């Protein structure tokens, strides 16, 4: 017995049906692409832990640690986009100080913007875009977002600050404004990963 022929769709399908079918297929492809991008955004992070085990954070795969003699305790930068950096600065503060004693998230964010990110005479202007307070592991963190304006370009910076045992920890990730939409989620994951462990 000969196999029955495969059904053939009539060529005279209504154009509205074809339009809907095309829209569904295109929508499914776009959703699939979007979901694969979301799942990849959490991937590609490595853990850095201080030699004494005091603190740890995540940094993007492919970034290299850079040795610095003055300033930040730890610096990483992207090999491909060399103006993308991640740095940890540790400063001494009064042992009795808490982050809340230094001011609200907005007050601390504005002060860091004026003194650290865009000090007078630096040629930079820092605009505090957002300041959020969060609790994690019994510590208060301030997560800060800045738009930084320089004479020849604009940059974006995310930072988190926390006080513990007389030290102010500031972890900051920075990129140029053109790359910001591509790395925003990644940078948020990095700065909120900072933890005090002992």
Question: What name fits each language-model region?
Answer:
Residues 2-26:
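Bacterial N-terminal signal peptides that target proteins for export
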Residues 33-37:
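C-terminal motif of bacterial Sec signal peptides marking the signal peptidase cleavage site
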Residues 60, 109-114, 184-191:
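Extracytoplasmic/secreted envelope proteins and their assembly/folding machinery
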Residues 66-163, 168-169:
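Conserved polar/disulfide-associated segments of primarily extracytoplasmic proteins
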Residues 166-198:
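Surface-exposed amphipathic alpha-helical segments
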């Amino acid at each position: 017995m000969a196999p029955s022929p495969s059904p053939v769709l009539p060529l005279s399908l209504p154009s509205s049906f074809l339009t809907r079918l095309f829209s569904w297929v295109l929508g499914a492809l776009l959703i699939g692409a979007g979901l694969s991008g979301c799942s990849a955004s959490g991937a590609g992070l490595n853990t850095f832990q201080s030699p004494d085990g005091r603190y740890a954070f995540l940094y993007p795969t492919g970034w290299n640690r850079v040795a610095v003699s003055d300033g930040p305790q730890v610096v990483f930068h992207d090999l491909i986009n060399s103006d993308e950096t991640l740095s940890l600065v540790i400063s001494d503060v009064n042992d009795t100080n808490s982050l809340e004693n230094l001011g609200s998230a907005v007050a601390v964010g504005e002060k860091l913007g004026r003194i650290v990110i865009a000090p007078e005479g630096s040629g930079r202007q820092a605009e505090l875009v957002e300041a959020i307070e969060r609790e994690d592991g019994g510590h208060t963190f301030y997560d800060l977002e800045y738009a930084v304006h320089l004479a020849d370009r604009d940059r974006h910076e995310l930072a988190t600050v926390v006080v513990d045992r007389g030290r102010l920890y500031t972890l900051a990730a920075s990129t140029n404004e053109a790359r910001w939409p591509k790395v925003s989620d990644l940078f948020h994951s990095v700065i909120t990963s900072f933890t005090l462990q002992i």
